[in-house]
Amino acid sequence: FIPQLVSVSASDTISRPSDNSVIFELVTARAHDANGLNDIRRVGFVSYHVEWDSFLNKGNLINLYDDGGEVVIYEPNFTSGDLNANDGIFSFRVPVFGAGNTDPSLQTKTGTFNWIFDAMDMSNTYSDTVIHRVIVEWNDLSYI
């Protein structure tokens, strides 16, 4: 059996902070496998910047987790934001870094993105992809 992505939930529009703060946008995907949830190896997405015709994060997968938010993914205490472990809903809190960060790698790019989701099971079989389009807006209040 092949894994399935039943649904994907993410904002359609994200306003990037204008200062040096960071906000977190929760992304979820409900996955199903006829062999059971234990047969799902991973759920995740890649982020494609439409205007730049390029993948962000070096094209690497951004993993979603079905861990109930109990596992620290990055120190000191960053968790997935997943609500309930082992319920088939995989989650990740995507960091959105403000324009005021002096390190360019900590400034979230603005523009149109296709978030391309898929799931893979334990036999390395892939689900069909689901594409979610999101707009990251420049949120600079100094122009108002």
Language-model region placement:
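Extracellular acidic, Ser/Thr/Pro-rich low-complexity tracts
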Residues: D12-P17, V27-N38, S47-E51, A119-D121
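Short, compositionally biased P/S/T/A/G/V-rich stretches that sit at domain boundaries
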Residues: F1-I23, I135-I144
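Beta-sandwich strand segments
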Residues: S123-R133
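Exposed beta-strand face motif in extracellular beta-rich ectodomains
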Residues: E25, K109-W115
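Solvent-exposed loop/turn segments flanking beta-strands in beta-repeat/beta-sandwich domains
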Residues: H32-F45, W52-L61, D67
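Aromatic sugar-binding surface patches on proteins
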Residues: E70-T102
